[in-house]
Regions:
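A short beta-strand-turn-helix
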Residues: 42-61, 90
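Bacterial N-terminal signal peptides that target proteins for export
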Residues: 1-8
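Thiol-based oxidoreductase modules, predominantly thioredoxin-like and allied folds used
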Residues: 41-42, 83-115
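Non-catalytic, surface beta->alpha helical segment in thiol-disulfide oxidoreductase systems
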Residues: 122-176
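Detector for the c-type heme attachment site
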Residues: 74-78
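Short active-site neighborhood of thiol/selenol oxidoreductases, capturing the structured segment around
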Residues: 56-71, 96
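N-terminal "domain-start" segment that seeds a small globular fold
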Residues: 23-51
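Bacterial N-terminal signal peptides
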Residues: 8-17
Length: 202
């Protein structure tokens, strides 16, 4: 019941948000050739600080690898994250840091090592995009993958992606219900939430 009340409040926010919310549904192509949303975290890429900031806000850090020409990355940006229910849920519960698999911005890992994005990706063993790490609690780990409570390897369909976000948000990665069982049990509810959010934002 509590989750249902929270979702009704979310829909009310969508309806009251109007034009401002509509703008949050459209990513822009950056000079790097990758789609970005304005609400992505403007990070110095010092990941320990990003984790602390997310947790202080009561949110989960989401570190997402993209690359130029990745069709699945574009689908995630243009379709999945533009889905009203998913878009609102991510902005409410997650802090998103976007990295480029072949980029050259300096990233500071949890052990203090500073490497360009492309070298950090190799250090972490990131081979394809999108790859998304979720960090939802404090950690003594020395690398981001070690700190990650859950990892999304690749691009999921909209309902599965939304379900995974909710599964992570509820802390099921920490000995809770396995994701596949969670998804099967809640798929009808997830689809209904998506339909309601579309109606509220139209």
């Amino acid at each position: 019941m509590l989750k249902r009340i929270q979702y009704i409040l979310l829909l009310a926010t969508l309806m009251l948000g109007g034009a401002a919310y509509a703008g949050d549904l459209e990513p822009t192509m950056g000079e790097d050739g990758i789609y970005h949303y304005d609400w992505y975290h403007q990070s110095f890429l010092e990941l320990e600080d990003d984790i602390t900031e997310a947790l202080d806000e009561g949110k989960i850090l989401m570190v997402k690898f993209d690359q130029v020409g990745c069709l699945y990355c574009e689908k995630l940006a243009l379709e999945t994250l533009a889905e009203p229910a998913i878009n609102a849920y991510v902005r409410e519960h997650f802090v998103v840091v976007q990295l480029d698999l072949y980029g050259n911005r300096d990233v500071t890992d949890l052990d203090g090592e500073i490497l360009p994005e492309n070298e950090m990706a190799r250090k972490w063993g990131v081979l394809f995009t999108p790859t998304i790490y979720f960090i939802g609690k404090s950690t003594d780990a020395t690398t981001l993958p070690q700190a990650s409570n859950a990892t999304m390897p690749g691009s999921f369909g909209k309902p599965t992606f939304f379900g995974f976000l909710q599964w992570v948000r509820e802390g099921n990665y920490d000995g809770g219900e396995p994701f596949q069982k969670y998804l099967v049990r809640r798929m009808d509810e997830i689809r209904s939430e998506m339909e309601a959010a579309r109606a509220a934002s139209s």
